[in-house]
Design a protein with these regions (language model features):
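ATP-dependent carboxylate/acyl-activation modules
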Residues: 3-161, 167-172, 179-180, 184-192
Length: 192
């Protein structure tokens, strides 16, 4: 019997960067290519470790892009405020930026792909962004801005989240991340 509380969070791992041209927003038919496990004495630390295990390592620049569908705008405010409190600069497309600004978030407006530079793609391709939060409106249409934003983010090594609950979980885990955490790659541990 274990007397200490232990939290374990299993997280799927997807290899979207290997699937050139594929939509990265998840549907019910999507299968993960692996999984990782974050184990810790509290939920937030286990969550952070699971994100690290899944390959999401932040921050580098503390700059992010948010472009969310209308039905996610209300929830996006809380997520944006969490990232803002963590020191992130938030760039957002016109309607998302306006909504965030109207609700107290210091979001910087950035042009859509089809508009003049600087635009969303300039930030992504210029390797000036750590994270993209883009919730799809229709998905799978390769001509739409959202698809191009998500695809280019993945192909240039920028982490891209497509749901507000995952974005909120990442912010929560980053709020509690610290240098005192012990990270162990179990693949390197002998005698397990």
């Amino acid at each position: 019997t274990c007397a200490l509380p232990i939290f374990a969070i299993k997280m799927p791992v997807f290899s979207f960067e290997k699937l050139r041209g594929a939509e990265i927003s998840l549907g019910p038919e999507m299968k993960s290519t692996g999984e990782c496990l974050g184990i810790a004495k509290n939920f937030n630390e286990a969550l952070y470790k699971a994100f690290i295990g899944a390959g999401i390592q932040l921050p580098k620049y503390k700059r992010m892009i948010m472009t969310v569908k209308d039905s996610d705008k209300e929830e996006s405010v809380g997520v944006a405020k969490r990232f803002e409190a963590l020191g992130y600069t938030i760039y957002a497309t016109r309607s998302t930026a306006k909504y965030l600004q109207d609700h107290g978030v210091n979001a910087r407006r950035v042009n859509k792909i089809s508009q003049e530079s600087p635009n969303v793609m300039d930030l992504i391709l210029g390797h000036k962004i750590d994270l993209v939060i883009d919730t799809p409106t229709q998905g799978r249409d390769k001509s739409r801005d959202g698809f191009l934003i998500r695809r280019n983010a993945i192909e240039t090594g920028v982490h891209c989240l497509t749901s507000m609950d995952t974005a909120n979980a990442l912010a929560l885990s980053l709020e509690t991340a610290n240098d005192q955490m012990t990270m162990i790659d179990i693949a390197t541990v002998k005698n397990l």
